[in-house]
């Protein structure tokens, strides 16, 4: 129970990229979330304005900024301690609101939710559902009218905001509350490019902003370096070499446990498979929607010959037993469980710790990022962000809320600098201390096992919910964790697309059409991909492939792309 009734649907566990994708436990990323993550439902938009790009670049190029006053003035303006008069209500229990969020917490206990209750006297009734079931549950709630006061997390999308906000009024406009009572959120909206990205086609802002200094690349394949060493293998650089490595993993006792049959050469995050990204090895760097960047232009690659070439290669490996047979059926806990038993040679993930069972620490683990393959023949990886993103579909307030203004003020207080530090790293005064030269993180290894778990990143805050840290701001760490994402970016940077795929609001007159076609195309793309990979449909049969292509067009592919301003379908 947290600040009221605790709802939790017992199901598969999940560590959201996003959650993990945006903020590593040992790093304080800007304007803090995500994964990127990219994932199947999140809507992130790139702030590609010159000012935003330069701010992110300067943050990386200079010495770490550990004092807020040393930040760029526009960003520094967002770092003042709370401008809310606390507590928000006179007595504990005088006010409350409910919040639906996708999160796989086993206990529902979050350190900073308790801290915010102490600060505000506002009870928050969390309704937590694992991501695997959250979308279905949210749809049921919205259809029944029995939805929470606040809906948060990766289940939201532009389509939902346009439908339930612009069209139906279930999600309420928030900009008047921001201007009246939320000076910190207002300063965040005033950062260059943010307000424009947050504003829906009808001129309203329907969500709490989530602005983040983002990773250039989210999900990538990680390869077990210890297995390579055990078998005397080199890091592969081509798809042929990669397949040969996977075959060796399968045929030999790569994990050294004496059993030559338990190795699983390749797997991926069940909820963020991202296998289509590997079409980039064949010159078609794609995202989960089938969109790609070719020669600097956003195109649709989901019916292209290069995507088919990738599917043929990947399906061939599946038929040879090199791919996890549970690729399309396992849940997160199964994936993580197999990884923690050292059964994987390669897995796609946001970070290797998501599945390996190896905790972050100052030393690099045995896992290496797999480099982009076939680079000498046009292999390229899709750049996810330019280093700075606005997530505009993370938190909405519904018409069931009795006091939307109070909810906005609660978030405005949560966005204070020290609350942001607490949400991302740990409470100031417990895990972080304020010194003359900035905020210092204690060595968490000195904590008891119980406290290490209590103050772990996942237990600080339901991390799918909006939070904020200023761009470029860093904590002082005497013994920082190994920065795996920085290593990924260093390896991938030379072989990534220069541009990113932009997400734009849909024209008001096209909302219903877009929503209907989007669902149909997404489902068809994913279902057909699974059937091709598993061999239920022959990817190498021309008639079968043409039937797939014809089916995509029949669903309205051209209209779907036109609504998004995309004119090219790669052949």
Regions found by a protein language model. Name each.
Residues 175, 200-274, 292-338, 395-406, ...:
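Helix-loop-helix "hinge/cap" segment bordering the ligand-binding cleft or interdomain interface
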Residues 6, 35-241, 276-279, 289-290, ...:
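Conserved N-terminal structural module of periplasmic/extracytoplasmic solute-binding proteins
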Residues 81-85, 133-139, 157-160, 191-194, ...:
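Short alpha-helical segments and helix-capping/turn motifs at coil-helix boundaries
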Residues 163, 269-289, 315-466:
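Extracytoplasmic/periplasmic substrate-binding proteins
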Residues 101-102, 409, 413-531, 536:
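Conserved small-residue motifs centered on glycine
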Residues 1-13:
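Short, Lys/Arg-enriched N-terminal segments with co-localized hydrophobic residues
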Residues 16-37:
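Sec-dependent N-terminal signal peptides of Gram-positive bacterial secreted proteins and lipoproteins
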Residues 93-97, 120-125, 144-149, 169-172, ...:
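Loop/turn elements at helix/coil->beta-strand transitions in domains of secreted/extracellular proteins
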């Amino acid at each position: 129970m947290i600040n009221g009734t605790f709802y939790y649907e017992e199901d598969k566990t999940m560590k959201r990229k996003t959650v993990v994708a945006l903020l590593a436990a040992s790093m304080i990323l800007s304007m803090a979330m995500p994964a990127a993550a990219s994932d199947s439902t999140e809507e992130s938009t790139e702030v590609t304005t010159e000012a935003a790009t330069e701010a992110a670049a300067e943050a990386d190029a200079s010495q770490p900024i550990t004092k807020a006053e040393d930040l760029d003035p526009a960003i520094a303006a967002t770092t003042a301690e709370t401008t809310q008069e606390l507590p928000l209500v006179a007595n504990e229990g005088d006010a409350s609101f409910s919040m639906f969020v996708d999160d796989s917490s086993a206990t529902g206990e979050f350190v900073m939710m308790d801290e915010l209750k102490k600060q505000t006297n506002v009870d928050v009734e969390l309704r937590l559902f694992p991501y695997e079931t959250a979308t279905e549950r949210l749809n049921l709630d919205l259809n029944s009218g029995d939805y929470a006061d606040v809906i948060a997390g990766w289940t939201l999308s532009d389509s939902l905001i346009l439908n339930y906000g612009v069209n139906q009024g279930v999600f309420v406009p928030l900009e008047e509350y921001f201007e009246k009572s939320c000076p910190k959120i207002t300063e965040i909206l005033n950062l260059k490019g943010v307000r424009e990205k947050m504003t829906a086609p009808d001129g309203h802002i329907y969500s709490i902003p989530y602005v983040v200094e983002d990773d250039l690349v989210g999900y990538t394949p990680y390869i077990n370096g210890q297995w390579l060493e055990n078998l005397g293998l080199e890091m592969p650089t081509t798809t042929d070499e990669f397949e040969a490595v996977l075959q060796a993993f399968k045929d030999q006792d790569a994990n050294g446990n004496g059993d030559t049959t338990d190795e699983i050469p390749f797997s991926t995050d069940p909820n963020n498979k991202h296998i289509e990204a590997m079409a980039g090895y064949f010159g078609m760097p794609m995202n989960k929607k089938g969109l790609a960047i070719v020669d600097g232009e956003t195109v649709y690659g989901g019916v292209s010959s290069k995507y088919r070439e990738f599917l043929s290669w990947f399906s061939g490996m599946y038929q040879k037993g090199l791919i996890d047979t549970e690729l399309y059926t396992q849940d997160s806990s199964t994936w993580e469980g197999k990884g923690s038993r050292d059964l994987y040679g390669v897995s796609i993930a946001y970070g290797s710790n998501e599945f390996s069972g190896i905790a972050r620490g100052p030393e690099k683990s045995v896992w290496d990022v797999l480099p982009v393959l076939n680079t000498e023949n046009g292999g390229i990886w899709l750049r996810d962000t330019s280093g700075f993103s606005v997530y505009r579909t993370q938190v909405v307030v519904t018409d069931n809320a009795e006091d939307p203004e109070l909810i906005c003020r609660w978030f405005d207080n949560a966005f204070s600098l020290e609350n942001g530090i607490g949400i991302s790293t740990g409470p100031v005064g417990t895990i972080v201390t304020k010194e003359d030269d900035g905020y210092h993180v204690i060595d968490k290894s000195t904590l008891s096992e119980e406290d290490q778990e209590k103050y772990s990143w996942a237990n600080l805050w339901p991390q799918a919910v909006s939070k904020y840290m200023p761009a470029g701001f860093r904590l002082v760490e005497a013994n920082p964790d190994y920065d795996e994402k920085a290593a990924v970016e260093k390896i991938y940077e030379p072989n990534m697309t220069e541009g990113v795929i932009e997400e734009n609001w849909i024209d008001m007159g096209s909302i219903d059409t877009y929503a209907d076609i989007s669902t149909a195309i997404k489902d068809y793309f994913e279902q057909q991909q699974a059937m091709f990979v598993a061999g239920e449909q022959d990817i190498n049969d021309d008639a079968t492939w043409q039937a797939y292509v014809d089916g995509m067009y029949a669903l309205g592919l051209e209209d779907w792309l036109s609504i998004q301003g995309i004119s090219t379908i790669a052949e």
